[in-house]
Design a protein with these regions (language model features):
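C-terminal regulatory/oligomerization modules of transcriptional regulators
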Residues: 1, 122-153
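Key DNA-contact positions within bacterial/archaeal DNA-binding proteins
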Residues: 35, 63
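Pre-recognition alpha-helix immediately N-terminal to the DNA-recognition helix
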Residues: 11, 18, 22, 38-41, ...
Length: 153
């Protein structure tokens, strides 16, 4: 019999894939692509980032991000502002119109989490989240923070 953690990487990857797929199904009515709502979600936590930093955080190419931002700006959800001291940089900010959409994204995320955690007691959910945060911190060389616990818990 195989050790339970032998296929951990595959299990985590497959579970994350299924979670993304279910979220996409639940969020379809919002009219945003996964890439668009990911940009909005990251900007909500990191208002005022420049495009290069955002691309790095999302692990996408800058040119790909530019196309996503162009669509979000055309939809009135994101604005690019000049950096106060570096004219080459544009700082990214959410517009007021983005906030109600973010609320709906959070509602979809909560519903998706409830579907994923169905049948798992709250204490076990918390334990799972804590173990994943610790595992991620071990691999990234960072300590977990209270902010991360709130964001993922």
């Amino acid at each position: 019999m195989e050790a339970p953690d032998r296929n951990l990487g595959f299990l985590l990857h497959d579970t994350a894939r299924m979670l993304r797929k279910r979220f996409d199904q639940n969020a379809r009515h919002l009219g945003l692509t996964r890439a668009q709502w990911q940009v909005l979600a990251v900007l909500a936590r990191n208002e005022g980032l420049h495009q290069g930093a955002l691309a790095e955080m999302l692990e996408i190419e800058p040119i790909t991000l530019v196309r996503i931002l162009d669509r979000l700006q055309a939809s009135g959800l994101v604005e690019r502002r000049l950096h106060p001291t570096d004219r080459r940089l544009r700082l990214l900010h959410l517009t007021e119109a983005a906030h109600p959409i973010l609320e709906r994204i959070h509602e979809v995320a909560a519903r998706t989490r409830e579907e994923a955690f169905a049948g798992i007691p709250p204490a076990a959910r918390e334990q799972l989240v804590q173990m994943l945060l610790t595992t991620r911190a071990n691999l990234s060389g960072r300590n977990t923070t209270d902010d991360e616990q709130v964001r993922y818990g």
